[in-house]
């Protein structure tokens, strides 16, 4: 095996271990935030939605800067610093008894993600060959699902004793992850050239096709982020106990572990990336619309199953399509900017979703927020269809697979 092939192989194992630690640390804490502050402490869903939206907006909205700096400095210092900041955010959340403290903790957590997320994504693009990326992203998603349910189980168990324990374990996992990267991650550069900060950002902003695609994904993410806000609250409301939330993540884990990889292998040979993304988005959209009418856990979990299946179809295609459109001369900048749709979608999805959820309760129309998400999903589908229609694209782009 050549030294390059060996580095790629070892690098992929490193990425998988690192990803598991990050996912565990995140899901120990974040799925329980809405349960802790909305249901246990009685805060308005809007207050918690603002906190979650701030984390999303800071982490993903500033991602282009984190990516551009990583293009200049390399991956390791950015990743280690970011993970320590995330740990500090969780430690602050443990003592949050007023909204501004929760908001501050989420901003710190988001700043940490701004530093470590783009270089980690760029490392995947660097270390995984283009023809293997779709399957590798599927493996990461399977790992995300297993880590999510494991983290949620740990967090739910700890929540019985004290929310501070939940935050402490999450912070500890990110400190361990920072040490893992500081010790084992080589001093790799992310881009094929040492790109100055301004040049890398400028290269992305001049790429009109990429910018349009990323901003369109705002609507997709407004739907996707509800697994952290409205879906857990709905499960808790119908079940009457926070422990039921773990079954929501168990459903995701089972579906992902059984369907994600084989579905990705099957669909990549038969459908283009944008077709898979749009099909998954439609399934997600039409599974969310009836949730406001669900009256028991069986109905709710059936709709959540359909939502996760849509995500399983869409997410590997979205990641692979984003990577395929990135310029190798500024990988970090591109991967950072690719998170901007998640920044806007997360902020609007959390804050807007929280406001609509409160309004639906006040007006005794619980279907209101879900109907609005349906409108957003259909609008996003039409925008993607317009961008990727045959007449608008240069020959060969639709056939491009990463």
Curated annotation (Swiss-Prot):
UniProt KW Oxidoreductase keyword: no
Covalent S-S links between cysteines: none
GO molecular function list: transmembrane transporter activity
Pfam family, one: MFS_1
UniProt entry keywords in alphabetical sequence: Cell inner membrane, Cell membrane, Membrane, Transmembrane, Transmembrane helix, Transport
Keyword Cell inner membrane: yes
Primary location class: membrane
Range of residues in the leader sequence: none
Membrane topology: Multi-pass membrane protein
Protein name as annotated: Multidrug resistance protein MdtH
Organism: Cronobacter sakazakii (strain ATCC BAA-894)
Taxonomic lineage of the native organism: Bacteria, Pseudomonadati, Pseudomonadota, Gammaproteobacteria, Enterobacterales
């Amino acid at each position: 095996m050549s030294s390059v092939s060996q580095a790629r192989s070892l690098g992929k194992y490193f990425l998988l271990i690192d990803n598991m630690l990050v996912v565990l640390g995140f899901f120990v804490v974040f799925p329980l935030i809405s349960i802790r502050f909305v249901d246990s402490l009685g805060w308005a869903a809007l207050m918690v939605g603002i906190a979650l939206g701030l984390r999303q907006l800071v982490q993903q909205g500033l991602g282009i800067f984190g990516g551009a700096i990583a293009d200049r400095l390399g991956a390791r210092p950015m990743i280690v610093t970011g993970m320590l900041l995330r740990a500090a955010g969780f430690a602050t959340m443990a003592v949050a008894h007023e909204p501004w403290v929760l908001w501050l903790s989420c901003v710190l957590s988001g700043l940490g993600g701004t530093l470590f997320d783009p270089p980690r994504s760029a490392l995947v693009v660097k270390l995984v060959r283009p023809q293997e990326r779709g399957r590798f992203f599927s493996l990461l998603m399977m790992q995300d699902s297993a880590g999510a349910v494991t983290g949620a189980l740990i967090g739910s168990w700890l929540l019985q004793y004290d929310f501070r324990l939940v935050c402490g374990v999450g912070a500890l996992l990110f400190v361990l992850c920072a040490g893992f990267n500081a010790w084992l991650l080589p001093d790799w550069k992310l881009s094929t050239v040492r790109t100055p900060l301004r040049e890398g950002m400028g290269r992305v902003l001049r790429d009109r096709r990429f910018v349009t695609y990323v901003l369109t994904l705002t609507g997709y993410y407004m739907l996707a982020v509800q697994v952290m806000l409205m879906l857990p609250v709905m499960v808790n409301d119908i079940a009457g106990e926070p422990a039921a939330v773990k079954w929501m993540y168990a459903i995701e884990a089972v579906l992902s572990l059984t369907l994600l990889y084989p579905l990705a292998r099957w669909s990549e040979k038969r459908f283009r990336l944008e077709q898979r993304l749009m099909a998954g988005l439609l399934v997600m959209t039409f599974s969310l619309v009836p949730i406001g009418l669900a009256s028991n856990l069986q109905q709710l979990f059936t709709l959540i199953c359909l939502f996760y299946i849509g995500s399983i179809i869409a997410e590997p295609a979205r990641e692979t399509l984003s990577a395929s459109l990135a310029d190798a001369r500024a990988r970090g900048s591109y991967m950072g900017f690719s998170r901007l749709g998640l920044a806007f979608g997360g902020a609007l999805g959390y804050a807007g979703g929280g406001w609509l959820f409160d309004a639906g309760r006040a007006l005794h129309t619980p279907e209101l927020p879900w109907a609005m998400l349906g409108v957003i999903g259909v609008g996003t589908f039409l925008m993607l269809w317009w961008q990727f229609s045959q007449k608008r694209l240069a020959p060969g782009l639709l056939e491009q697979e990463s």
